[in-house]
Amino acid sequence: MPARSPEPLPDHSSVCSPGCADLPILAASGLGFSRAGRVVFSGIDLALGPGDLLQVLGANGSGKTSLLRVLSGLVAPDEGELHWRGRPVRAGDPSLLQALAYVGHANGIDPELSPVENLRFAARLAGVAATPDNVQAALAAFGLERVMHAPARSLSQGLRRRAALARLALARRELWLLDEPVTSLDADAAARFQAQLDDHLRAGGMAIVATHALLPGARTLRLDARS
């Protein structure tokens, strides 16, 4: 089957600082984070541009999830700096939050809503157009057509994970931050996720993925567990 030609992502270059065209879109220098007096990670440097994929490896407790939360702007680092399009950003910065999609361990799926209702609700929160065609395409990308109207509480963990990942296909955000995205997925769903990730990168998107499963073509950042 020939490779698909995904539509390019929306152009956000107008929010650049002067001269940012020559800089990474996302850059971090010396990031550190502690919890309850314990250093979770420190000295993290990274830089991403269009089409870049970074996999974050490490044992359980090494700080992979905490790093994603810092990079997402959900929590502030204790040291270091984070830059988005050449501008320093802090936790909660709208320019970063509006450009990223985050899927964590918790799927964020309302168990009382169906997959289609969950996608419509997530789209409203994100300010994304949720036309019937867009929602149908996102659900189809993850093979959810037959269960799209079933309450999420009646679905398996794997199907709920598919519904969470379908939001990526709908939102078309520039930066994906994903925490163990293939957890609970069968081989078919994992292949569908990989196809969406490949499309995202070919369209100029970026992704940082905390994972135990190696990703083809990814650069690697390895975190060490701290006692």
Swiss-Prot record:
It catalyses: heme b(in) + ATP + H2O = heme b(out) + ADP + phosphate + H(+). SMART domains: AAA. One of its GO terms (molecular function) is ABC-type heme transporter activity. InterPro entries: AAA+_ATPase (IPR003593), ABC_transporter-like_ATP-bd (IPR003439), ABC_transptr_haem_export_CcmA (IPR005895), P-loop_NTPase (IPR027417). Residues 26-227 form the ABC transporter domain. GO terms for cellular component: plasma membrane. It is an enzyme of class 7 (translocase). One of its GO terms (biological process) is cytochrome complex assembly. It is a peripheral membrane protein. Transmembrane segments: none annotated. It is found in: Cell inner membrane. ATP binds at G58, A59, N60, G61, S62, G63, K64, T65. Keywords: ATP-binding, Cell inner membrane, Cell membrane, Cytochrome c-type biogenesis, Membrane, Nucleotide-binding, Plasmid, Translocase, Transport. It comes from the Bacteria. Its main location: membrane. Pfam families: ABC_tran (PF00005). Its EC number is 7.6.2.5. The keyword ATP-binding applies. Belongs to the ABC transporter superfamily. CcmA exporter (TC 3.A.1.107) family. Part of the ABC transporter complex CcmAB involved in the biogenesis of c-type cytochromes; once thought to export heme, this seems not to be the case, but its exact role is uncertain. Responsible for energy coupling to the transport system. The complex is composed of two ATP-binding proteins (CcmA) and two transmembrane proteins (CcmB). This is Cytochrome c biogenesis ATP-binding export protein CcmA.
